[in-house]
Amino acid sequence: MTAKNVGLTSTNAEVRGFIDQNLSPTKGNISFVAFPVSNTNSPTKILPKTLGPINVNVGPQMIISTPQRLTSSGSVLIGSPYTPAPAMVTQTHIAEATGWVPGDRKRARKFIDSDFSESKRSKKGDKNGKGLRHFSMKVCEKVQRKGTTSYNEVADELVSEFTNSNNHLAADSAYDQKNIRRRVYDALNVLMAMNIISKEKKEIKWIGLPTNSAQECQNLEIEKQRRIERIKQKRAQLQELLLQQIAFKNLVQRNRQNEQQNQGPPALNSTIQLPFIIINTSRKTVIDCSISSDKFEYLFNFDNTFEIHDDIEVLKRMGMSFGLESGKCSLEDLKLAKSLVPKALEGYITDISTGPSWLNQGLLLNSTQSVSNLDLTTGATLPQSSVNQGLCLDAEVALATGQFLAPNSHQSSSAASHCSESRGETPCSFNDEDEEDDEEDSSSPE
């Protein structure tokens, strides 16, 4: 009722001094003080936007604090929410204090909460100091030091470090566990996308940082030589197994023919059971032999050099392998040897018949004969009778190591170079604006 008498409210009890729509609402609290009027001596009538001189006798105060709109007309009592003493501000004082013009939607700087801006700047500083880049570096160091780890192990250690009271960090820069675990999750995804780490189920393994082209080329050359040596070892093992099969089957056929000629098996004292070993030494060598009671263990002591030959070596010297290991195999023996192995391995018998040089065949840099008839785009062998199956299979193995390029195929050249591409070309730089946007996103990837 008092506010209505002094002209601050309209007839329907609305605050008339705060109806102007050009002003934006303030976030602060404005204190309004309404005084009951005991006696007024103003004979003039109060017009809508003018206030005449008023003599007011002040009684008990009632403070109403509510966020409302500011007005540019009339006299109001405003006060800071932090100081209880009200102050009288007239129309001209409000215009000078706020400094706004009609149409300007920005609030006066005087009414901005300074504490809010300081906390925002503090939060921004913490975010720049402990963002995704910072946690990526920490996670990278953890995984590199451990070699093999898991997400929970890395996250638990980082949570322990950042929440440890002994850590010299500011009190307002402490991170909650959920935020740290989310940052660790994002950092692991970034490192995995850059091929720095690998993840299989819950196991995380360290691969390595991207290197320059020279070092990558050197590493590829070392890997290439290692694979070539492995191919040679596999070829030697395959050759030994094929020769054993040929020797055993050839021995079986010979014994079968002898039984047919002699019309019965040979005498027991004239046969040697497989497997066996033969020890060869000089006639002047003194041999001390000890045999266990069960005759399963033998101990030999020699005072001179000696040789040990197994049954396969003996069969080779007997000619049961048709001389394939030395490259002295006739066409008839080669045909017979092919009949003793599966059809899929006949091509390797032809390669073995060339001698020990077969172990290095197709692995030299200047030797492209084995891949000249190989379609690199599909990995299939072109139908030519002059190319045997063994060489084609070797070419496929060599091609997998990046050794060969087709001489007349530009497409295959680009494909091979793409396979040996350096990991250093993986984009590893991030935009600062994108990083800030990611950090402002509060949604957890979990």
Curated annotation (Swiss-Prot):
<feature type="region of interest" description="Interaction with CEBPA">
    <location>
        <begin position="60"/>
        <end position="82"/>
    </location>
</feature>
<dbReference type="GO" id="GO:0005654">
    <property type="term" value="C:nucleoplasm"/>
</dbReference>
<feature type="region of interest" description="Disordered">
    <location>
        <begin position="409"/>
        <end position="446"/>
    </location>
</feature>
<keyword id="KW-0805">Transcription regulation</keyword>
<dbReference type="InterPro" id="IPR038168">
    <property type="entry name" value="TF_DP_C_sf"/>
</dbReference>
<dbReference type="GO" id="GO:0000785">
    <property type="term" value="C:chromatin"/>
</dbReference>
<feature type="region of interest" description="Dimerization">
    <location>
        <begin position="219"/>
        <end position="292"/>
    </location>
</feature>
<feature type="modified residue" description="Phosphoserine">
    <location>
        <position position="24"/>
    </location>
</feature>
<dbReference type="Pfam" id="PF02319">
    <property type="entry name" value="E2F_TDP"/>
</dbReference>
<dbReference type="GO" id="GO:0003677">
    <property type="term" value="F:DNA binding"/>
</dbReference>
<feature type="compositionally biased region" description="Low complexity">
    <location>
        <begin position="409"/>
        <end position="419"/>
    </location>
</feature>
<dbReference type="InterPro" id="IPR036388">
    <property type="entry name" value="WH-like_DNA-bd_sf"/>
</dbReference>
<feature type="DNA-binding region">
    <location>
        <begin position="129"/>
        <end position="210"/>
    </location>
</feature>
<protein>
    <recommendedName>
        <fullName>Transcription factor Dp-2</fullName>
    </recommendedName>
</protein>
<keyword id="KW-0539">Nucleus</keyword>
<dbReference type="GO" id="GO:0006357">
    <property type="term" value="P:regulation of transcription by RNA polymerase II"/>
</dbReference>
<comment type="similarity">
    <text>Belongs to the E2F/DP family.</text>
</comment>
<feature type="short sequence motif" description="Nuclear localization signal">
    <location>
        <begin position="103"/>
        <end position="118"/>
    </location>
</feature>
<dbReference type="GO" id="GO:0045892">
    <property type="term" value="P:negative regulation of DNA-templated transcription"/>
</dbReference>
<dbReference type="InterPro" id="IPR036390">
    <property type="entry name" value="WH_DNA-bd_sf"/>
</dbReference>
<dbReference type="Pfam" id="PF08781">
    <property type="entry name" value="DP"/>
</dbReference>
<keyword id="KW-0010">Activator</keyword>
<dbReference type="GO" id="GO:0008134">
    <property type="term" value="F:transcription factor binding"/>
</dbReference>
<dbReference type="InterPro" id="IPR014889">
    <property type="entry name" value="Transc_factor_DP_C"/>
</dbReference>
<dbReference type="GO" id="GO:0045944">
    <property type="term" value="P:positive regulation of transcription by RNA polymerase II"/>
</dbReference>
<feature type="modified residue" description="N-acetylthreonine">
    <location>
        <position position="2"/>
    </location>
</feature>
<feature type="region of interest" description="DCB2">
    <location>
        <begin position="274"/>
        <end position="330"/>
    </location>
</feature>
<feature type="region of interest" description="DCB1">
    <location>
        <begin position="229"/>
        <end position="261"/>
    </location>
</feature>
<keyword id="KW-0597">Phosphoprotein</keyword>
<dbReference type="InterPro" id="IPR037241">
    <property type="entry name" value="E2F-DP_heterodim"/>
</dbReference>
<keyword id="KW-0238">DNA-binding</keyword>
<dbReference type="GO" id="GO:0051726">
    <property type="term" value="P:regulation of cell cycle"/>
</dbReference>
<dbReference type="GO" id="GO:0090575">
    <property type="term" value="C:RNA polymerase II transcription regulator complex"/>
</dbReference>
<comment type="subunit">
    <text>Component of the DRTF1/E2F transcription factor complex. Forms heterodimers with E2F family members. The complex can interact with hypophosphorylated retinoblastoma protein RB1 and related proteins (RBL1 and RBL2) that inhibit the E2F transactivation domain. During the cell cycle, RB becomes phosphorylated in mid-to-late G1 phase, detaches from the DRTF1/E2F complex rendering E2F transcriptionally active. Viral oncoproteins, notably E1A, T-antigen and HPV E7, are capable of sequestering RB protein, thus releasing the active complex. Interacts with GMCL.</text>
</comment>
<dbReference type="GO" id="GO:0019904">
    <property type="term" value="F:protein domain specific binding"/>
</dbReference>
<dbReference type="GO" id="GO:0005634">
    <property type="term" value="C:nucleus"/>
</dbReference>
<keyword id="KW-0131">Cell cycle</keyword>
<feature type="short sequence motif" description="DEF box">
    <location>
        <begin position="176"/>
        <end position="210"/>
    </location>
</feature>
<dbReference type="InterPro" id="IPR003316">
    <property type="entry name" value="E2F_WHTH_DNA-bd_dom"/>
</dbReference>
<feature type="modified residue" description="Phosphoserine">
    <location>
        <position position="122"/>
    </location>
</feature>
<comment type="function">
    <text>Can stimulate E2F-dependent transcription. Binds DNA cooperatively with E2F family members through the E2 recognition site, 5'-TTTC[CG]CGC-3', found in the promoter region of a number of genes whose products are involved in cell cycle regulation or in DNA replication. The TFDP2:E2F complex functions in the control of cell-cycle progression from G1 to S phase. The E2F1:DP complex appears to mediate both cell proliferation and apoptosis. Blocks adipocyte differentiation by repressing CEBPA binding to its target gene promoters.</text>
</comment>
<feature type="compositionally biased region" description="Acidic residues">
    <location>
        <begin position="431"/>
        <end position="446"/>
    </location>
</feature>
